[in-house]
Amino acid sequence: MRNTFRNPALQRLHDMGDGQGKHPWRAMNFTRGQAWSRPDAAVPELWFLESGVLVLEQIFNNCLVEVALIGCNLGVLLPEHSEGRVRALLDGQGFALPVAHVASLCPEVLLQTQQSLVRQMAVWTYCTRHHALPQVLADRMLWMEPASLTWSMDTLPWGGQGTSAAVERAVQELQRAGAVRVEGGGVQVVSVDVLRRMACGCHTSLAETASATLMPSTPAERMPPA
């Protein structure tokens, strides 16, 4: 049977009979560069994407620090203003659901969403600490499905690793290898194959297994095969 949603968490909620007419699935449309945080008095929400990419930023030492990429295989709890924000790296759309509703309907989805986000944050930290910036850039650009995307230098998903000069050198290395082309201040992917060879693989390997981490929705589905 064809899935209704690309995001496995939304599909799970839908499969459990929670159609959009039964509670306020708030539809979202966003464009690159927009940012949001939750007002202190607002109802906590989980955001699930159907397209686009967000980056989660947390506040450390009074500065916003990027800590995780959020795509269509993941959900994120919208942080309070005092904790950080989410920012759109690509145009997209999705749905916002009250946390309390998700918890009451399917606590497994809430648990798996939290666990997936922790894994994503751990991968981000490991990647930025252990891999060279050209590898990091290639991996994140590949994860974000960039075949027809043109980046500006200030929107590249480099995660604050190094300096702007280091980012320029990393882009030049990708260009010399034939992965990207720099023209008019924009960075265009010209070879996904070269980009894949240069990428460290941290985020792309995580994305391949993310959908499988969601637990079955009913006790019968969780029973081992006879």
Locate the predicted segments by residue:
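Glycine- and acidic-residue-biased ligand/ion/polar-headgroup-sensing regions
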Residues: 33, 43-61, 71-73
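Short histidine-centered beta-strand/loop micro-motifs
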Residues: 35-41, 57-59, 78-79, 126-129, ...
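Cyclic-nucleotide recognition modules
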Residues: 63-119, 123
